[in-house]
Structures are given as C-alpha cells and as structure tokens.
C-alpha cells in the first residue's frame, strides 16, 4: 500500500480537500494504527493499508450527503462509531457539520476523545453510552444519522428513528446484501430516497449508500 493511496483516492472521488484536511486524515490514520496495536479498535489484517481504505470509504459518502443536507451546520449522529469511522473523517472535511459519536465500548470512546483533542476537532461530541439511552436523552435532536457498523438495516432504522428531527435522514452504508436487508424494512414506515453506488478506489467490493427518511414521525419532545 503506497503512501499516495489516500491522495489518489481523494482525487478519484472528485473531492476538493485542503492540505490541512489531508494532513489531519493522515494523522488520524497514524493514531488509529498506533492505538489498534494495543487496544484492538478494529479487526484489520494489513493495518495501515486497510485503515487507509476505510478512510476513503468514509469520505466517499460526502458527495451524496452534501446533496441531501442543505443545512449549513447539520447535526449528525454516528451510531456505533467504533474507531471513529465514518464520523472522524467527515468531521475533518466538514468542520461546520456537528457530529455526535455514540459508542458503548469505553476503550473505543477513550480513543475517540484522544483523537478529538489531538486533531482539535471542536465539531464532534463523544458519548460513551448505548444508543437506546442516548435516544431517551436527545430525542428528535438530529438532522441525520449515519453508521457503517450495523449489519441489520431494520435494527439500525429502529434505533435511528427516535433520534431524528421531523424529515430527518438516515444514511446507511451497506454492501451487496443491501437488497436483502431492505426486504425486512417496512415501506409503510420508511421512504427510500436514494440508493447510491459508492465507487471506492482500490477496494474491490460493492459499496452502497442508502438514504432513507421516516414516513411515520415521532412527536417532538416537549
């Protein structure tokens, strides 16, 4: 895996990133690689190369997200953030977006807090708790929810719904099983706005970004 893979991926995705963006992504990569050796943040084989591809996978969602999020500073929750993917790369590239990283495993939230300080990311909040508990505390507070951690789309949507504002959006990062998972989603409850293929340079797997909005709305908290 060459040092230029991240730069090549950014170019092939058509993203216009500043030198500081790229430097911060590389620093995040270095910190994740270093912490992963001790804390096993993510199951990867070829550490730096694989994480680099995970970085590109994370920022590949940005063109679609920008189309669907007209707000200047949308509030977005990353459910099961793990090692900070996709939220940390998104926060680096979009400093006006406010991201809340929800993760129940404390060694992972310790890493997320470390990265927040190391990269001086003022636009992220790290919450060490279960998603269900956060939904009780911050019901109807988010413009969008995203995750790459959930293999069960229906479960992800159920957890996302209480967090969303009316007309909020869910961005589900999926692979080739997306069609099978969609069969378990009630179209009476959810409207599929987009099913976008994501072309990840140097990653020979199918990646898709589903964009959904709830048909049934939860009442806003009083």
From Swiss-Prot:
UniProt: S-adenosyl-L-methionine binding residues: 80, 85, 131-132, 148
Compartments (UniProt record): Cytoplasm
InterPro entries membership: rRNA_ssu_MeTfrase_G (IPR003682), SAM-dependent_MTases_sf (IPR029063)
Name of the protein in question: Ribosomal RNA small subunit methyltransferase G
Pfam families found in the cross-reference section: GidB (PF02527)
Catalyzed reactions: guanosine(527) in 16S rRNA + S-adenosyl-L-methionine = N(7)-methylguanosine(527) in 16S rRNA + S-adenosyl-L-homocysteine
EC number: 2.1.1.170
Record keywords: Cytoplasm, Methyltransferase, rRNA processing, S-adenosyl-L-methionine, Transferase
Protein's job: Specifically methylates the N7 position of guanine in position 527 of 16S rRNA.
The keyword Magnesium is assigned to this record: no
Gene Ontology CC, one term: cytosol
GO molecular function terms noted in the UniProt entry: rRNA (guanine-N7-)-methyltransferase activity
Species this protein is from: Polynucleobacter asymbioticus (strain DSM 18221 / CIP 109841 / QLW-P1DMWA-1) (Polynucleobacter necessarius subsp. asymbioticus)
Gene: rsmG
Family per similarity comment: Belongs to the methyltransferase superfamily. RNA methyltransferase RsmG family.
């Amino acid at each position: 895996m060459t040092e230029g893979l991240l730069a090549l991926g950014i170019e092939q995705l058509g993203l216009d990133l500043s030198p500081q963006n790229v430097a911060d992504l590389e620093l995040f990569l270095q910190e994740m690689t270093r912490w992963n050796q001790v804390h096993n943040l993510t199951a990867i084989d070829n550490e730096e190369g694989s994480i680099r591809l995970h970085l590109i996978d994370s920022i590949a969602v940005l063109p679609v997200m920008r189309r669907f999020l007209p707000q200047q500073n949308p509030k977005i929750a990353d459910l099961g953030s793990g090692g900070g993917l996709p939220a940390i790369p998104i926060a680096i590239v979009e400093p006006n977006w406010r991201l809340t990283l929800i993760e129940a495993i404390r060694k992972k939230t310790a890493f997320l807090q470390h990265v927040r300080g190391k990269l001086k990311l003022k636009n992220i909040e790290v919450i060490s708790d279960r998603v269900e508990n956060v939904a009780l505390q911050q019901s109807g507070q988010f413009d969008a929810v995203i995750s790459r951690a959930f293999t069960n789309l229906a479960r992800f949507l159920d957890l996302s719904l209480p967090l969303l504002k009316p007309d909020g959006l869910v961005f589900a990062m999926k692979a080739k099983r997306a069609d099978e998972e969609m069969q378990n989603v009630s179209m009476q409850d959810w409207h599929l706005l987009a099913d976008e293929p994501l072309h990840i340079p140097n990653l020979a797997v199918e990646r898709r970004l589903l964009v959904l909005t709830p048909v049934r709305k939860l009442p806003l908290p009083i």
